[in-house]
Amino acid sequence: VLVEISRPDDAVLRKRLDDGKFHDCRDDENAVAVPGLLVYRLYAPLIFANARHVMMRLRSLVDEASPPVKWLIIDAQAIHDMDLTAAQRFAELHREFADEGIDVKIADAPRPFREELAKVGLSEEIGSQDFFVSVKKAADAFEHKYGASGSSAV
């Protein structure tokens, strides 16, 4: 049980070609990664026991991405609970990513998740423009800004 809590299941979501939605897809499914966009889903609460592991995992995914990540979308739908320690760690990582020019967006965030972000002052830093009702809406905003290839549309 301790291992399950400290190293929870997660996924990098990919865009399915048949419906354009982002899913946790097997390698043999008809889905693609969008260049410059990393969509991450955690299948657990974000708490003291797993915060370090999850933040290291996110750091690793961003560092290994090619091309480099421009936007990191956190699919927060399964993060039904987050404690203060985890919120603080998330805030630290968010600031690191911001310093590196990586925009962090939050999709489908439950109320408890948003409340913990507010407690550590992160909801003001992220801003309402960085919260989306779904991963699809967030990814659409990314593609509107950068195009489907991830290069600047401006």
Question: What is each stretch, according to the model?
Answer:
Residues 13-154:
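Structured cytosolic domains appended to multi-pass membrane proteins
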Residues 1-11:
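Flexible hinge motifs at transmembrane-helix junctions and intramembrane kinks/re-entrant loops
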